[in-house]
Amino acid sequence: MRMKEDHMLNGQLKPGYNIQVGTENNFVIGYDVFPNPTDTRTFIPHLENVQKRLGCKFKFAIAVAGYGSEENYDYLEKNEITGIVKYTTYEKEIKRSFRKKTFNTENWKYDAEQKEYTCPCGNPVPYRMTVTKKNKSGYLQTYEVYQCENCEGCPFRELCT
């Protein structure tokens, strides 16, 4: 990993490391050093390393939103670990300003029976397909794709797409 800023302004990028520390009752029970620039991909290896070193299996894991990802939630569930981990957009989503953004697709009305959203202009946005992608760590993520059939000539098209 490299630092994002060149503090010396000489064109040399400095190496950076991501330190993870696990605690229980305010005592450090383990730490790891990673080259990953984000916390998301350090969660599972750090948890496994600490459990291995301590020779135990955790029942609970608490982490901040930076660790929230589908892969991490899936890992916790499969390993029967109760996780208290906010998802990354939680703080943004609870704000009134976020909920007032009518063209944000997360605020659109969803009809589970029809499996379609309704855009702010009243047009149906039906389910089209499911796409599976492999992330850098090899985890398969599944996405549902929805597509409006009647966007031609809509004056708000740029706000939706």
Protein language model annotation of sequence segments:
Residues 1-161:
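Anion-binding and metal-coordination hotspots
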